[in-house]
From Swiss-Prot:
Name the UniProt record assigns to this protein: Protein-glutamate methylesterase/protein-glutamine glutaminase
EC number: 3.1.1.61, 3.5.1.44
Reactions catalysed according to its record: [protein]-L-glutamate 5-O-methyl ester + H2O = L-glutamyl-[protein] + methanol + H(+); L-glutaminyl-[protein] + H2O = L-glutamyl-[protein] + NH4(+)
Compartments (UniProt record): Cytoplasm
Length: 357
């Protein structure tokens, strides 16, 4: 049984979230709190496994409360965010601090709209409960670096003569914002490839994520726009609610955004991106799958490997918030290197050499 504490300054939200969670057999709501100070007292008293935490509250806000929870109790926290600009920025900050994941409060007719997020809420709480306590950082001196050989053996470094063209694609979900913060800022600004990122996230939040990563990085980071050129030395974050692909035209690579649905139901979808990149037959590709629930990215990576000329990297279990997406690709035999999140940028950079010979 997963024991949950619900923290929100709205009595309506406390009741609705509690009711939704209580309907799930493996979840027990053991208490509620109206603000951060009350939450900290109840955590000590009730010993929950998972906490849902409103981002914007009086007395002690969600960000400050989250810091205390992680510092003192090291428990998984699901943030409950408004869709205001302030709410979005605070949510991205909370994910970077170490929140497990987040859901968005309803924006329209409150009772009807809230039911749309019930499935997401339950899924995230269950995943958080199964993940146990948040993992402490692992010493870099003791990290193993296992290698898993691909079942389909791709041609890794044989682009067409004289091209030297390369592209990097990354897929991630739960835990991704914090993981990306450990990868993107370490990439050099003169990286000789565009980087296209799929982070499972609702519409509106990816712009805040891109802005935050751009502020932290030497390499340029932006939310992708339909039809723009995919240029070397730039990171393109797929907008929430859209699928992203990359195509080749007479001038180079171009970003395409659309509303196509995928079997995984994710939008953006790593499978969708990877399949499009796999079609760039005269490009060297680096595909990275990082922390996240589910298996998005595995099917697309398999297609990329079949097309060839790919280096596939997965985040290690020890550094993942949720070892789902990388695990699926590893189990399928599609991964060449398994790397701790702290080492992924170096691995990408070594694959994407500044000069080709």
């Amino acid at each position: 049984m997963i024991r949950v504490l619900v923290v929100d300054d709205s009595a309506f939200m406390r009741k609705m979230i509690s009711d939704f969670l209580t309907e799930e057999k493996q979840i027990e709501v053991i208490g509620t709190a109206r603000n951060g100070e009350e939450a900290l007292k109840k955590i000590e008293l009730l010993k929950p496994d998972v906490i849902t935490l409103d981002v914007e509250m009086p007395v002690m806000n969600g960000t400050d409360t989250l810091r205390k929870i992680i510092e003192i109790y090291n428990l998984p926290v699901i943030m409950v965010s408004s869709q205001t600009e302030k709410g979005k920025e605070c949510t991205i900050n909370c994910l970077e601090i170490g929140a497990f994941d987040f859901i968005t409060k309803p924006s329209g007719s409150i009772s009807l709209d809230l039911y749309k997020i019930k499935e997401q809420l339950v899924e995230r709480v269950v995943a958080a409960g199964l993940s146990g306590k948040r993992k402490r950082p692992v010493s870099q001196t003791v990290r193993p670096e296992p290698i898993v050989r691909a079942v389909v053996k791709p041609e890794l470094s044989k682009p067409k003569p004289g091209t030297g063209r390369q592209i990097v694609c990354i897929g991630t979900s739960t835990g991704g914002p914090r993981a990306l913060q450990k990868v993107i800022p370490k990439l050099p600004k003169d990286l000789n490839a565009p980087v296209v990122v799929v982070q499972h996230m609702p519409e509106g939040f990816t712009a805040s994520l891109a802005d935050r990563l751009n502020h932290l990085s030497d390499i340029q980071v932006k939310e992708a726009k339909d039809g723009e050129a995919a240029l070397n030395g730039c990171v393109y974050i797929a907008p929430g609610g859209k699928n992203i692909s990359v195509i080749k035209n007479s001038e180079g690579l171009q970003v395409v955004l659309d509303n196509h649905d995928t079997p995984s139901r994710h939008k953006p979808s790593a499978d969708y991106l990877f399949r499009s990149v796999g079609k760039l037959t005269d490009y060297e590709k680096v595909a990275v799958i990082m922390t996240g629930m589910g298996s998005d990215g595995t099917a697309g990576l398999k297609d990329m490997l079949t097309a060839g000329n790919v280096k596939a990297i997965a985040e290690s279990e020890e550094s993942c918030v949720v070892y789902g997406m990388p695990k699926a690709a590893v189990k399928a035999g599609l991964i060449h290197e398994i790397k701790h999140v702290e080492d992924i940028a170096a691995s990408i950079t070594s694959c994407v050499k500044k000069e080709r010979v």
